[in-house]
Amino acid sequence: MNVSFITQYTSSIDADAAILLQVEKFEKTFGLELVDPNRIIKKGYLIENFQGSFGSQIKFLYLEGSPFAFVKVVGLGKEQSINDETWLKAGGLCVSEIKNYPKKVVVFADALGIDVSTTQIMNFVLGALLKQYSFECYYTDKKKSKQKNKNILELVIITKNAENCQKELKQVQAICEGVNLTKELVNEPANILGTEEFVEKIKKLEKLNVKVQVLDKEKLKELGMNALLSVAQGSSRPPYLVIMQWNGSDNKEEEPLAFVGKGVVFDSGGISIKHSSGMEDMKADMGGAGTVVGLMHTLATRKAKINVTGVVGLVENMPSCHAQRPGDIVTSMSGQTIEVINTDAEGRMVLADVLWYCKTKIQPKLIVDLATLTGAIRIALGEQHAGLFSNNEALAKQIIKSGEATSEKVWQLPLGLEYDKLIDSKFADMKNSSGGSAGSITAAQFLKRFVDEKTPWAHIDIAAVCMGNKLNEFNNSWASGFGVRLLNYLIKNYYEQK
């Protein structure tokens, strides 16, 4: 979908549809006189008792005297409640449910009754762009399509901030591309996206000047990454460690920020096999890696002025005569030994070695890891927040604020010695599962043993927000693409060169 910005409407635009935005109970609507010279819409307001509450909509076809065949008015809600998230959702709402009508849509964006900023307009555009994505490539019957806005080819935004918005457009498009790439990776079935196929997807980033390094099984053995390898040994699919480098800083030698992703392309649970109910969702157990790849795409596309390294560990966790067993003890890359209590607590085994590699080989300024790590995080926080754990309060606060700014919210949970002792083992340095309460916390506590206090580190458990959520105002997809927008905001607003 093409997007453009203008300061005022002219008949030469020749659009099929118009969208107006209404602040709740405010008397006037920007663009109403032009769109509806015969004042029919106002009568519709009265008949339908339309007042502009958030998400409310009223639609009109072929209004007499109107230059548009289709007109929709969307409510923004009460003035004091309108924020950046409102505009993100409004963008998705505005392009929804208008199939069969427009090819070109004009949006009168400067809603009367409030001061509309460039940031809010760009959130609106992002919401509209994100809403366009759907994963329907495996339908042979195209009538099953749930996408209701495929016909929109061009979105024309009318705003006094047109010039500034045009300057920001490429940034927003880059974010959308990264989110959609993450969604695509998470949505793909595991028979299509195995470890080797995932590597090939990542290599496409090289076209954007991202340096990609792939370490295979033999190299992982040389490095002593036995925790990661132990997870992979039950599958015929080979394990990989993939390092992605974007050097956008003026100082190419500057310490990078590092983002680590869990990439279990399918998680059966291994010998500690999962229940069959819902196991199909475990194709998304590579969601953390998917987010890191999407983030790297966004940073490279918008040419971020910073050095960033993404590292993902790719494995498949399957039961077989070669699979690891409960009771096995493995020596991680760090030299610390791990007793395997539960083969379904595999993500932390992968991350243990990846985090240690990141800390010792890359030596970054900070590390943020993302993983669909625990089912317990859904019990603790539901689907509204990801879980956040950190050894650095300044970094944690930055991530929390970034989540609030992008509507990808996180909630910080505690770490401490009381939890750490729960993963002590009778036979090794630690065990991979405490087997009791505080499952998300003890999993994070396990990861903490593979980073040090000198390096700011944060772990984001995205198991409840990565996939399977209810569709919302700006997402049509089973996969949410969670994390790309949050981390891009974190980088741009707290670390990137201005």
Curated annotation (Swiss-Prot):
UniProt-annotated binding residues for Mn(2+) 1: D267, D344, E346
Xref: Pfam families: Peptidase_M17 (PF00883), Peptidase_M17_N (PF02789)
Keywords: Aminopeptidase, Cytoplasm, Hydrolase, Manganese, Metal-binding, Protease
Cofactor binding note: Binds 2 manganese ions per subunit.
Cofactor(s), names only, from the UniProt record: Mn(2+)
Localization per record: Cytoplasm
EC number: 3.4.11.1, 3.4.11.10
Residue positions binding Mn(2+) 2: K262, D267, D285, E346
CC terms in the record's Gene Ontology section: cytoplasm
InterPro entries xref list: Leucine_aapep/pepB, Macro_dom-like, Peptidase_M17_C, Peptidase_M17_leu_NH2_pept, Peptidase_M17_N
Main location: cytoplasm
The UniProt record lists the keyword Hydrolase: yes
GO BP: proteolysis
HAMAP family: Cytosol_peptidase_M17 (MF_00181)
Alphabetized PANTHER family for the sequence: CYTOSOL AMINOPEPTIDASE, LEUCINE AMINOPEPTIDASE-RELATED
Biological role stated in the UniProt entry: Presumably involved in the processing and regular turnover of intracellular proteins. Catalyzes the removal of unsubstituted N-terminal amino acids from various peptides.
Protein name: Probable cytosol aminopeptidase
Organism: Phytoplasma mali (strain AT)
Name of the encoding gene: pepA
